């Protein structure tokens, strides 16, 4: 959720923040026609041009903090996994080279990787150690993929992540030192992935549609930062957390104030969007990584990882549950927004027409930034 103060002519100039809307935001016609949210051929082009050529987030190193730890990737139906061995964290196949069975499930710790079907055994580097009853051991190992690391986030894509985020002004706020993974949510969305990003990148709806979130954060003091492949929104606290907007958020307000001994956090939230599909979020004593995985033009899988300081994750379960409930309340509300948007677009498409509305500045500037990035990355002129 957020807004920008950036003119489209400045998108390739690294970081921009706190710029005057009147001076820097030009009228734009970068809105996307309704057909782009439902076209199967275009969807396949997006997967190739944007996702396979993008940063390719696969997980955080905190998913596997100890040697022998493994964590299967839910976004890939456990087809690959992160494994920590003596050399560090590896991304490798979780499919046995014998009869192509999924070997490990979920997360845990192993000395070796053993397929339950025929006991083929691999070491933590993916090399085959033994194949029972074979006179000559096959030379078949698990495929491994090189990784990039930024603040513990692991990427397999071709983009230079460190270069993309080199001038990120909130990098220290998104530092995971002292944190641990608590849980992962998989949320299925019945709408296009671009619609999700659009809702995430605009604050116009926060007050009218989010009674809970809109009484936790204040969009009156938004600060924006833009780069060629990312945007950041930083928002303040609403009314000193004195007026919660829903019973669920009442518990979240109370948990934040109780843990901080009444001292107000420095921000309400920080939302980083790294295109096309990665969101890293800061809340008081919480870091969240959310990634979108398009299943089809009208179906998107959102994998959400929740990280907390070790003290909170281990001993403050009321805090964890309060934050999780507040987050998911807002998530469900965002679903309704996105579903209504795609339903209206589909109605127009069936009518044989397309309509787009103006951007509200500054509250929808983030959506404009995304649309301009999309057109540039896709070389789309429709």
State what each model feature region is:
Residues 20-34, 177-179:
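Short, contiguous pre-domain boundary segments
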Residues 36-75:
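Non-catalytic accessory segments flanking enzyme active sites
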Residues 53-59, 63, 127-131, 271-276:
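Short Pro/Gly-enriched beta-strand edge/turn motifs at strand-loop
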Residues 58, 103, 128, 213, ...:
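Short clusters of hydrophobic/aromatic residues that line enzyme substrate/ligand-binding pockets
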Residues 63-159, 166:
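Rieske [2Fe-2S] iron-sulfur-binding domain
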Residues 83, 94, 146-148, 153-155, ...:
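C-terminal catalytic domain of Rieske-type non-heme iron oxygenases
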């Amino acid at each position: 959720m957020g807004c920008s103060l950036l003119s489209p002519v400045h998108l390739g100039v690294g970081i921009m923040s706190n710029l005057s809307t009147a001076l820097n935001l030009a009228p734009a016609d970068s809105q996307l026609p309704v057909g782009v949210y439902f076209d199967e051929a275009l969807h396949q082009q997006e997967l190739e041009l944007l996702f396979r050529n993008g940063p390719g987030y696969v997980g955080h190193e905190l998913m596997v903090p100890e040697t022998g730890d493994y964590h299967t990737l839910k976004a890939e139906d456990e087809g690959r996994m992160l494994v920590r061995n003596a050399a560090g964290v590896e991304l490798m196949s979780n499919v046995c080279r014998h009869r192509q069975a999924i070997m490990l499930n979920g997360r845990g710790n192993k000395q070796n990787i053993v397929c339950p079907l025929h006991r083929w055994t691999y070491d933590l580097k993916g090399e085959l150690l033994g194949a029972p009853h074979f006179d000559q051991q096959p030379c078949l190992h698990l495929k491994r993929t090189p990784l990039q690391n930024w603040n513990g986030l692991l990427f397999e894509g071709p983009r230079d992540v460190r270069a993309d985020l080199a001038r990120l002004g909130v990098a220290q706020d998104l530092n995971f030192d002292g944190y641990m993974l608590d849980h992962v949510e998989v949320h299925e969305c019945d709408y296009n992935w671009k619609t999700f990003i659009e809702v995430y990148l605009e604050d116009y709806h926060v007050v009218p549609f989010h009674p809970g979130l809109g009484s936790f954060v204040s969009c009156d003091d938004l600060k924006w930062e833009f780069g060629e492949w990312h945007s950041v929104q930083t928002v303040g606290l609403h009314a000193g957390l004195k007026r919660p907007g829903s019973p669920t958020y009442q518990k979240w307000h109370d948990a934040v104030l109780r843990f901080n001994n009444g001292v107000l956090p420095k921000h309400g939230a920080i939302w980083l969007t790294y295109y096309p599909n990665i969101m890293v979020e800061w809340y008081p004593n919480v870091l969240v990584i959310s990634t979108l995985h398009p299943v089809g033009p009208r179906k998107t899988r959102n994998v959400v990882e929740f990280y907390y300081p070790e003290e909170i994750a281990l001993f403050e379960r009321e805090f964890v549950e309060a934050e999780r409930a507040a987050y998911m309340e807002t998530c469900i509300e965002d679903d309704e927004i996105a579903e209504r948007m795609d339903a209206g677009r589909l109605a127009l498409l069936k009518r044989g027409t397309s309509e787009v509305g103006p951007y509200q500045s500054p509250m929808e500037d983030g959506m404009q930034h995304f649309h301009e990035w999309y057109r540039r990355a896709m070389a789309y002129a429709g």
